[in-house]
Amino acid sequence: MDFLTSELLGVEETLQLTSELTNRESIWLDGRLTAGEHAALVKHNRQLDPSLPLARSIAEIVEQKIIDSPLLKSFALIRRVHSILISRSEVGDGYGWHVDNPFSKHGRRDLSFTLFLSDLSDYEGGELTFQLLQGSKEIRLPAGQIILYPSSSLHCVQPISSGVRLVCVGWIESYIQSTEDRSLLFNLDAGAKGLLARHGRSDELDLIFQAYANAVRRLSGR
């Protein structure tokens, strides 16, 4: 499994985060300031000034929510969450096909995430679109939902045709760099935990958890 979607914020939590982002034009900067040289050519949006206390506060809340999620921790095997940004896209804005830079000054980018902050009824367009071997995959999620995906993915954000799209984006450095290895470990962990919940602990299940822990050690180089 390369992609994962999950609810990260409830309705009230999402409204609380976004309440201070509306009707304040001075807090937004040109989104191209945080893009690489090639990606900047196709990036058209605005981003919350990262130097503002508001931006740092939102980033801290989102980071902690991700770290506290058992599902996201199991899927991403999180070493650190970093480079969190708030993006605002209006009519005509979008982000053409690109691949995220592999590194930032804060760490390696193994997984990217988009946390949707706007209700689906607030805008049209703005689909997060991935180029896959079998074709393209479009994602539009309700407010409070997050998607994690490999940072190596070729993806784009379709132009906004009406309304305003607010999202929080960021990156995860994983203990396990390989997407395939993370997928293997996630399936093993999910299966073992499912058996534990259904049947309780057993000596055989202890061996599976031991194998999982030692596989993480080996694949992480630790």
Curated annotation (Swiss-Prot):
Binds 1 Fe(2+) ion per subunit. Its cofactor is Fe(2+); L-ascorbate. 2-oxoglutarate binds at R165. PROSITE patterns: FE2OG_OXY. Fe cation binds at H98, D100, H155. It is an enzyme of class 1 (oxidoreductase). The keyword rRNA-binding does not apply. The keyword Iron applies. One of its GO terms (molecular function) is L-ascorbic acid binding. It comes from the Bacteria. Gene3D superfamilies: q2cbj1_9rhob like domain. InterPro entries: Oxoglu/Fe-dep_dioxygenase_dom, PKHD_hydroxylase, Pro_4_hyd_alph, Pro_4_hyd_alph_FE2OG_OXY. Residues 80-174 form the Fe2OG dioxygenase domain. Pfam families: 2OG-FeII_Oxy_3. Keywords: Dioxygenase, Iron, Metal-binding, Oxidoreductase, Vitamin C. Its EC number is 1.14.11.-. One of its GO terms (biological process) is intracellular iron ion homeostasis. NCBIfam families: PRK05467.1-3 (NF003974). PANTHER family: PKHD-TYPE HYDROXYLASE YBIX. HAMAP family: Hydroxyl_YbiX. This is PKHD-type hydroxylase Syncc9902_2001. The lineage of its organism: Bacteria, Bacillati, Cyanobacteriota, Cyanophyceae, Synechococcales.
